Amino acid sequence: MNIEILGKSFPMSMGLDAVKEITAKMGCTMEQMGDVMTAGTPEEQLANITVMAAAMARSAYRREKVRCVLWGEDCKLVEPPDADQMLCAFDLLDSKKLIEAVTETMQEANKTTVDVEPSKNAKSHA
C-alpha cells in the first residue's frame, strides 16, 4: 500500500519495526492496534492514525534501505515525513485517504495464502 503526501507517493509496510514503534507509542498490544484507531475524540483518532501511518511509511523506507544494501544497489530514497509533518500535510478532506491507507496496510499484513497441490492434499471420503 502507498500513501500520497503532497503529490509524492510513499510505500507503507506493517513490518515488525512498525509494530514495535506503534505499540510503544500507543501503549497498546498488537491485537489492540485496531482499537487505537477508533479510541478517543475524532482529533485524537486522526493523530493516532497519523502516528501509525508514519511508522508504516518509515518501516517500508527502512526495508528498502536494507534491500538496497543486501543487493549492493545504489538506491536514491526519500525519507518519509514524520507524524507531525503528516499532520501539517493532510487536511480533513485527506483524512479518509489516510485512514484507508493505514487500514489496508494492516489488512495486507494479516493476509495469509494457502498453496493447494492436489497431489499432496488428502482426499475426502465422506
Q: What annotation goes with each model-predicted range?
A:
Residues 1-4, 28-44, 61-126:
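Charged interaction scaffolds used for protein-protein
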Residues 10-12:
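Short, isolated positions in well-ordered beta-strands
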Residues 15:
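Residue-level signal for threonine
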Residues 22-27:
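Short amphipathic alpha-helical "interface-anchor" segments enriched in bulky aromatics
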Residues 48-59, 104:
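Short, hydrophobic/amphipathic alpha-helical patches that form generic packing surfaces
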